From Swiss-Prot:
UniProt organism field: Leptospira biflexa serovar Patoc (strain Patoc 1 / ATCC 23582 / Paris)
Modified-residue entries (N6-(pyridoxal phosphate)lysine), positions: K264
Main location (coarse class): cytoplasm
Protein known as: Glutamate-1-semialdehyde 2,1-aminomutase
PANTHER family: GLUTAMATE-1-SEMIALDEHYDE 2,1-AMINOMUTASE (PTHR43713), GLUTAMATE-1-SEMIALDEHYDE 2,1-AMINOMUTASE 1, CHLOROPLASTIC-RELATED (PTHR43713:SF3)
Lineage, top ranks: Bacteria, Pseudomonadati, Spirochaetota, Spirochaetia, Leptospirales
The family this protein is said to belong to: Belongs to the class-III pyridoxal-phosphate-dependent aminotransferase family. HemL subfamily.
């Protein structure tokens, strides 16, 4: 059994051979690796080869693959129940744990993905304001719901397209799009459309079209204008929530949203999303209010208990400073090795345990139109050199990398040894 054979078989029965576009390697070329096992910082391919993993399932695995403490909880849960479709104590425990530690999360509803979370939060925003228009930003990805799949990132970036076919103009006619980091255009739009906008949705740390940290002044302007015009501010913290700090970007910046969406880490490696916010907004959700949202597997016991164990460890152990330091150690080491080989055209953007290797630019990149045109092909070359040595990055130059607590000092040093070998090719 090998990846090439499996990929050809998969293409016969699965669109493009994959269940999420970026996995196809279409952005970097070549045949995607099929993996069969994972533990700690490592993936094992079906061929039996080990790879140091810096994709980490695109972010959920704060403590690495199959952390023993989390696995123990999962196995215990599997022996008790898989799904109830009824009330259970586990989601209550997780909800209480979060609301007691994040003041702006007064109530929370669990769903099965970040896409579901954002979709539901927008519904709440429209109901609460009586308005229909949604404002988003070019390059911010909020899942594959129709209204926000406009000028997005994630897999669409790798496909050289910012929109999806099959979304009618009548669906997105109420979607407004602006570039990031442009306060004047933001003010102009609010002066013109402010009374019609239900919600401003933003990744406070855009991380789906590269890593584009925003100026605090821009995020403050989003909060200022939404408050002034009665627009709800939605922070999409599916990636940044519990990843850059326990309280996410809202906690770091002190900018408090009306609604917030979570995913990835909140489920401890299982498919869980959540939307949350002020009590008066969340009380609009059925059955307490008129905004309908439901799900067969929402708050499934495996995801709830894995999530609670993960967040408990994150809260009590506070791995964030060490992860930030390890991320800098990794990226500084890679850049040094590239420079020693005479390639000084790279730099790294880091934020906490997220990193993005990119072409060097004169000024920090905050918008997607500032990304060098050569980035995609340059990254693809570096990706395959590292892959050949057993280092696995996300297979797109527009996806970010992640570290976990499983990425010890020894593993980072081994990664740098492998990088040195890769650059000799």
């Amino acid at each position: 059994m090998n990846s090439e054979t499996l990929f050809q078989r998969s293409k016969q029965v699965v669109p493009g051979g994959v269940h999420s576009p970026v996995r196809s390697f279409s952005s970097v070329g070549g045949t995607p690796i099929f993996f069969s096992e994972a533990r700690g910082a490592y993936l094992k391919s079906v061929e039996g080869n080990d790879f140091i993993d810096y994709c980490l399932s695109f972010g959920p695995l704060l403590f690495g693959h199959r952390h023993p403490e989390i696995q123990e909880v999962v196995e215990d849960t599997v022996n008790k129940a898989w799904s109830f479709g009824a009330c259970e104590p586990y989601s209550l425990e997780l909800a209480e744990f979060i609301t007691e530690r994040i003041p702006w999360v007064e109530k929370i509803r669990f769903v099965n993905s970040g896409t579901e979370a954002v979709m539901s939060a927008l519904r709440v925003a429209r109901a609460a304001t009586g308005r229909n228009k949604i404002l988003k930003f070019d390059g911010c990805y909020h899942g594959h719901l129709d209204q926000l799949l406009v000028k997005s990132g994630s897999g669409l970036a790798g496909l050289s397209s910012s929109d999806s076919k099959g979304i009618g103009p009548e669906i997105i006619q109420n979607t407004l799009v602006l570039p990031l980091d442009d306060e004047s255009k933001l003010e102009e739009l609010f002066q013109r459309e402010g009374s019609n906008i239900a919600c401003l949705a933003i990744e406070p740390l855009p991380a789906n079209y590269g890593l584009l940290p925003q100026r605090i002044e821009f995020l403050k302007k989003c909060r200022e204008l939404t408050t002034k015009y009665g627009v709800l501010l939605l922070f999409d913290e599916v990636i940044s929530g519990f990843r850059v700090s326990f309280q996410g970007m809202a906690g770091i910046t002190g900018i408090i949203p009306d609604l917030v969406c979570y995913g990835k880490i909140i489920g401890g490696g299982f498919p869980v999303g959540a939307y949350a916010g002020k009590r008066e907004l969340m009380d609009l959700v059925a059955p307490s209010g008129p905004v309908y949202q439901a799900g067969t597997l929402s708050a499934n016991p495996i995801g709830m208990r894995a999530g609670l164990k993960t967040l408990t460890k994150a809260w009590t152990e506070n791995p964030y400073p060490a992860l930030e330091s390890a991320t800098k150690q990794l990226t500084d080491g890679i850049l040094t090795l590239l420079s020693e080989k005479g390639d000084t055209n790279w730099e790294a953007v880091t934020f906490g345990s997220l990193f993005w290797l990119k072409g060097k630019t004169e000024n920090p990149i905050r918008r997607i139109d500032q990304i060098p045109g050569t980035h995609k092909s340059n990254f693809a070359t570096l990706f395959h050199k590292l892959l050949k040595q057993g280092v696995y990055l996300a297979p797109s130059g527009y996806e970010v990398g992640f570290l976990s607590t499983a990425h010890t000092n020894d593993i980072i040093n081994l990664t740098l040894e492998k990088t040195k070998k890769a650059l000799k090719d």
